């Protein structure tokens, strides 16, 4: 089949694109990095030499002005007078406000302070003594007048002129000298060191006036250190005995002394201390204390127990010595029992006899040891007190050995009775019988010792 040729399509222009009415903003430009600013380096500074110091001469010293004719003397007092209105210059109203520099004129000069000049006042030691209240008469008056004239001349010589009025001097007008103090003063002048009184003064008695030693005053006056003021103070008028008695009566109150007396316990008679009754009570207490000591009432329990044990110690020593002797005799007789021949016998052939000998030996040794201990406590007082363990040990051994001795003696007696019933009596049996009697008596002594040990133990508990 034949193919038909294809014709190409005509070329057409593309349709027009509509344009927008509003303009489009241009794209933002790209930010370019700013180049770094060049850093300027300062030029190196030139070293300048330090300035030289120029030494200036010190200012001349100001010479003090020459002293004025009315210069002060050493020891004078200076007082600054208060400024007066007449000496100072009147203050202006605008001088009190500081200047702010707006006005043409400069700041006004500050007002000058008044001229200060030292004032010399009379020293207290140069003041004349105040006039004495009493009229100077006799020798004392003449001395006071001479002292006043000397003080006035001294004041005129120093140039004080008219002295200021003196202060009122304090005087002691309540001092008085009693006749007793005058007598003690005379004794003091006659003897340099009087002996002190053996009895202390009563607290209700007013104290004596202080004694003035005239000798010391005379020495002070002679040394030149006394002044008219001191002389006027030391020369006090002596009071009469009546005035001294009046002062003493004012301080003494019999009612107050009776109330505050240590011997007075109350106002009523029932509350007053009776000396004889107090002595009688003391005697009764002493008799009661002595009776209590005799009866053991005031003795400590341990001491009373030790005394009770000591009272039984002699009996215990006697019984223990007897037990030791009887036990020694018993085992000695049993050990010596021996017969020879075809019918001979010996204690070692029988167990019961050996048992009796061993127990008697132990009891004898124990009794001898206990006897020595009790004798030592009787002789030496420092071994009186014993420990509680020793009391327990003594009681236990006494009872145990008494039981063993009774057991051994009974066993030996049974064996001896059986031998006699079979073979009759001979020398061996008779020795065994006598030894057993000694062993039984030793048992009785040891039993009594056990009772004493029990009493001692319960006394110490």
UniProtKB/Swiss-Prot annotation:
It is a multi-pass membrane protein. One of its GO terms (cellular component) is plasma membrane. The keyword Membrane applies. Coiled coil: none annotated. It comes from the Eukaryota. Residues 1-314, 376-392, 453-461 are cytoplasmic. Residues 336-354, 414-431 are extracellular. The keyword Protein biosynthesis does not apply. InterPro entries: CASP_dom (IPR006702). Residues 7-69, 193-204 have a biased composition (Pro residues). It is found in: Cell membrane. Residues 116-126, 135-155, 205-221 have a biased composition (Low complexity). Belongs to the Casparian strip membrane proteins (CASP) family. Homodimer and heterodimers. This is CASP-like protein 4U1.
């Amino acid at each position: 089949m034949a193919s038909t040729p294809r014709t190409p399509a005509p070329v057409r222009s593309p349709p027009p694109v509509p344009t927008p009415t509003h303009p489009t903003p241009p794209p933002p430009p790209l930010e370019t990095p700013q180049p770094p600013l060049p850093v300027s380096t300062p030029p190196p500074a030139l070293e300048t030499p330090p300035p030289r110091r120029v030494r200036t001469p010190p200012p001349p010293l100001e010479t003090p002005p020459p002293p004025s004719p009315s210069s002060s003397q050493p020891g004078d007092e200076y007082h600054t007078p208060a400024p007066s209105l007449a000496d100072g210059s009147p203050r202006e109203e605008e001088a009190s406000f500081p200047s702010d520099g707006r006005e043409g004129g400069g700041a006004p000069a500050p007002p000058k302070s008044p001229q200060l000049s030292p004032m010399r006042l009379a020293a207290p030691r140069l003041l004349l003594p105040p006039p004495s209240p009493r009229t100077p008469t006799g020798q004392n008056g003449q001395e006071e007048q001479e002292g006043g004239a000397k003080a006035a001349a001294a004041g005129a010589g120093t140039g004080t002129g008219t002295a200021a009025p003196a202060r009122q001097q304090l005087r002691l007008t309540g001092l008085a000298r009693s006749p007793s103090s005058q007598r003690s003063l005379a004794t003091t002048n006659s003897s340099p060191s009087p002996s002190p009184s053996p009895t202390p003064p009563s607290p209700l008695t007013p104290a004596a006036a202080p004694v003035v030693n005239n000798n010391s005053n005379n020495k002070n006056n002679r040394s030149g250190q006394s002044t008219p003021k001191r002389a006027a103070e030391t020369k006090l008028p002596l009071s009469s005995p009546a005035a001294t008695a009046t002062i003493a009566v004012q301080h003494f109150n019999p009612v107050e002394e009776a109330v505050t007396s240590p011997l007075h316990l109350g106002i009523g008679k029932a509350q007053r201390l009776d000396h004889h009754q107090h002595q009688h009570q003391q005697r009764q207490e002493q008799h009661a204390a002595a009776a209590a000591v005799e009866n053991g009432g005031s003795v400590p329990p341990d001491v009373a127990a030790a005394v009770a044990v000591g009272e039984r110690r002699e009996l215990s020593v006697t019984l223990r010595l007897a037990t030791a002797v009887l036990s020694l005799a018993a085992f000695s007789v049993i050990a010596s029992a021996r017969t020879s021949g075809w019918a001979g016998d010996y204690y070692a052939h029988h167990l019961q006899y050996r048992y009796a000998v061993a127990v008697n030996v132990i009891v004898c040794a124990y009794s001898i040891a206990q006897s020595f201990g009790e004798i030592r406590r009787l002789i030496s007082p420092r071994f009186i007190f014993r420990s509680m363990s020793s009391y327990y040990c003594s009681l236990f051994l006494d009872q145990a050995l008494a039981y063993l001795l009774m057991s051994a003696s009974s066993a030996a007696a049974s064996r001896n009775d059986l031998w006699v019933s079979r073979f009759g009596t001979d020398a061996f049996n008779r020795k065994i019988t006598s030894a057993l009697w000694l062993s039984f008596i030793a048992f009785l002594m040891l039993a009594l010792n056990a009772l004493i040990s029990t009493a001692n133990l319960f006394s110490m508990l």
